[in-house]
Curated annotation (Swiss-Prot):
This is GPN-loop GTPase 3. One of its GO terms (molecular function) is GTPase activity. Belongs to the GPN-loop GTPase family. It comes from the Eukaryota. The record marks 74 as: Stabilizes the phosphate intermediate. InterPro entries: Gpn, Gpn3, P-loop_NTPase. The gene is GPN3. Heterodimer with GPN1. Binds to RNA polymerase II (RNAPII). Interacts directly with subunits RPB4 and RPB7 and the CTD of RPB1. A motif (Gly-Pro-Asn (GPN)-loop) lies at residues 72-74.
């Protein structure tokens, strides 16, 4: 039997730990057993029980206090993750060999772990050797994405992780429950975006022709390949959480021995799910 894993990624403050905690609760309500592994050696606290915690192996504070190393916060975290990559046997012992495991890996937020270093790619390869089907779950804060330039930046960060890890990836806008009604209306256009329409919004204030040309090329690339789309994640709405889980389950073919249906909103590129979600928000 295969095992299943979500690699929960995203910038610091995007809600990775909150996502793990709420997704575990949601799965428990569905009578599904889901475990969490903390892979952030700089984590201070989280609202979920863990089956493994990288801080039992190595902590950033201990590395920074080592006078022979003299690392700062970022250097210390990189050292910790490279040490972790050299000690995957520790993780293997923590995970055990239970079939049909479903595990969320709460990852650090530093983008250089996905763009400059091989650590996360090595982790994916190791999990696959242990017969895990791995899906990347990339989170961005919806409050950060309400402007065109910030949205494009978020897409590039998600695309960077996707290209680096070469695994199925579901991209999520978190903290939808914290947005005002006006902000929710603004964010709706970013969930299934017309990149050329966003291009007009984002380049109107640019003075440099070179930057306008670059932005146009980026928007064209994103639109032509349609590789990055975002799903809304509202921890106060069970339907929103269930739709996200369905997409992830489909990506890793969770429960493939059962009759499995592709998430219905994929039948139409301009999905009705977004309309239903925002209509409910407006009716509240």
């Amino acid at each position: 039997m295969p095992r299943y894993a979500q690699l929960v990624m995203g910038p610091a403050g995007s809600g990775k730990s909150t996502y793990c905690a709420t997704m575990v609760q949601h799965c428990e309500a569905l009578n599904r057993s889901v475990q969490v592994v903390n892979l952030d050696p700089a984590a201070e606290h989280f609202n979920y029980s863990v089956m493994a915690d990288i801080r039992e192996l190595i902590e950033v504070d201990d590395v920074m206090e080592d006078d022979s190393l003299r690392f700062g916060p970022n250097g210390g975290l990189v050292f910790c993750m490279e040490y972790f990559a050299n000690n995957f046997d520790w993780l293997e012992n923590c995970l055990g060999h239970v079939e049909d495991d479903y595990i969320l890996f709460d990852c650090p937020g530093q983008i250089e772990l996905y763009t400059h270093l091989p650590v996360m790619k090595q982790l994916v390869q190791q999990l696959e050797q242990w017969e895990f089907r791995v899906c990347g779950v990339f989170l961005v804060d919806s409050q950060f994405m309400v402007e065109s330039f910030k949205f494009i930046s978020g897409i590039l960060a998600a695309l960077s992780a996707m290209i680096s890890l070469e695994i199925p990836q579901v991209n999520i806008m978190t903290k939808m429950d914290l947005l005002s009604k006006k902000a929710k209306k603004e964010i709706e256009k970013f969930l299934d975006p017309d990149m050329y329409s966003l291009l007009e919004d984002s380049t109107s204030d640019l003075r440099s022709k070179k930057f306008k040309k670059l932005t146009k090329a980026i928007c064209g690339l994103i639109d032509d390949y349609s590789m990055v789309r975002f799903l809304p994640y509202d921890q106060s709405d069970e339907e929103s959480m269930n739709i996200v889980l369905q997409h992830i389950d489909f990506a890793i073919q969770y429960g493939e021995d059962l009759e499995f249906k592709e998430p219905k909103e994929r039948e139409d590129e301009s999905s009705s799910m977004f309309d239903e979600y925002f209509q409910e928000c407006q009716d509240e």
